[in-house]
Amino acid sequence: MHAKRIFRACLLVLAATIGWQSPSVAGTAKGEDQQHAFDFHFGTWKTEIKSRDVTPSSVGEWVKFNGTVIDQPLWNGKANLEKIEASGPGGHFQGLTLFLYDPRSGQWSEQFAGSDDGTMQEPTYGEFKDGRGVFHGWTESGGKKVLERDIWSNITPDSYHYEIASSFDGGKTWVTNFVAQLTRLKKAPDYDTHYTPGTGPEHDFDFNMGRWSTRIQAVPHPLSSPAAKSSLGGTHEAYRVWDDWANIGQLEVDGPGGHRIEDLALRLYDRKTRQWRVYLANSTSGTLDAPVVGEFKDGVGTFVGMDEVDGKAVLTRNVWSDITAKSCRQDWAISTDGGRTWVSTWTSTDSRGG
């Protein structure tokens, strides 16, 4: 994880911690309880789907799918991760959706990725009111940006309805393109993920699965005070979401003042480019950063992206090295000169266990 994100989380950490609540119908979500609006969604569900292609000039026929949705809480309910797998006349697909709660706005974001390219789609944003969740954002249709609306409704402890619609006239009218009716199978999510051992690049992060203790040297202000470091400690746990294209790492760190800092890294494999995209978020901001992108070569993983430090746009680089069965190392650095020189911002050493 990146030092800047950790210390941003330290600055934004809530003055009071809101405790976890048992699953409840979303109609009770208001004020601070909005962060528990998705508690009803935790568990394992049967889904019946119908989907169709919609463009400004045509509306396709409905295609039906049947499958399973598994949703698990993260960060004590301030985030959740949904897995979906379904089959039908239109084929078979796997996907995941990450939901993040932003305590500053009191809203949720929703972002989907499919197994075909391992790329998070643009988010929709919204909240729940009177038992109904309404989210808005952008999507693409016919190569053009159009408005998208997602609605969660008819929510009971054992069922709910979900649909997606597009608007080609700025929100005046909407055309539904995706409908799902879900029925609960289990209150608890099925955490077990089928695993097929392999040596291809889609298995590059297999070494990291499990629980680790981590020691961190972080540089809070790498541009103005690159030599000033802070020592942090915590735990890092990684597990598979889908066998060969998605996994997640969660980091918990004891931050300043005894506050617990929670970060996650969602790692998605692109089968076409044979690269990984790593998306980062923390529970204090509740937003998903643009990914760092890269691959492993000769036992070293290198990932590069863009970031902002002290108001400046910079390159950021994440390197995994010294990988063994019981330990590994991560180095983060930034560059203000296009990658010619790098300033260290973060070094972590992980040991299995913790």
What is each of the regions a protein language model found here?
Residues K4, A15-A16, A26, V314:
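A detector of low-complexity, intrinsically disordered, Ser/Thr/Gly/Pro/Ala-rich segments
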Residues Q21-P23:
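N-terminal twin-arginine translocation
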Residues V25-G354:
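Hydrophobic small-molecule pocket/channel-lining residues, especially in calycin-type beta-barrels
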Residues H2-C10:
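Bacterial N-terminal signal peptides that target proteins for export
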Residues A9-G19:
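Bacterial N-terminal signal peptides
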